[in-house]
């Protein structure tokens, strides 16, 4: 599979990149950085450092994209520490970012190989929305768009109604869901259901003592502490890397449904909420077209196995 990852590189974004670099059959063709978790230039350094740690320095270009959301001001995520890497203090990578803008890189790569490139969008959707506004043909030329964001009509992680990626740029999310892409959506609801590693799984990874399992141990430290305070046990959550694992191996999906996904852009309390509903609502409403497949349950065992393979 030929893949572009659009990322706000921090914590779990980096394990997703490791999966894409290390899983046989996957070619990570480019990384595009988007506004999100931590200050923009730090995210670029985190992406470059991750590529270097994985042994792919100079082989995967990194492009800089949108530095702020479309309408509302940027807000950092507090999940991953100030540097997004739990203070792991990785050396500055030798590779430097490209000069071409991420939006143009996405358009160029997709239009050069229509129907061949998948995009994994694991950040606010600003870059993808700007790309499809500039070149609407990419909606049909991207083979598949795998999105991590929103909830399945459930509780979010940044507000009770919203997940971070859609909350930060709901206008961009709305544009992307209305653009005609072939979308699979992996939500925060799925994250809490299928992506968690419990204490025994974490011990198994730490016991591997490989350079990449050590990278995982260090970079996941702050989110694990936050999760322990919030959920009462030392779990680790993997919204982005589960989405990547599903993209690389859709057999992980145990249950999914076709749905209409609409993003709330105006609600005072519900801004960034993803309404996930069937195409026909009743006679007060027009019929809506299905615009995404929403993953409900994925195999935690299969995901855990893929992560261990990537770290080995
Ligand atoms: C998403 O937001 C970010 O904090 C994570 O990187 C992930 O993409 C989870 O809400
Ligand atoms: Ca992310």
Question: Which ranges hold each PLM region?
Answer:
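Short, mixed-charge, low-aromatic patches
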Residues: 1-7, 60-66, 85-87, 126-132, ...
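Short, surface-exposed amphipathic charged segments that create phosphate/polyanion-binding patches used
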Residues: 75-82, 159-163, 202
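A residue-level signal for conserved active-site and pocket-lining positions in enzyme catalytic cores
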Residues: 62, 176, 244
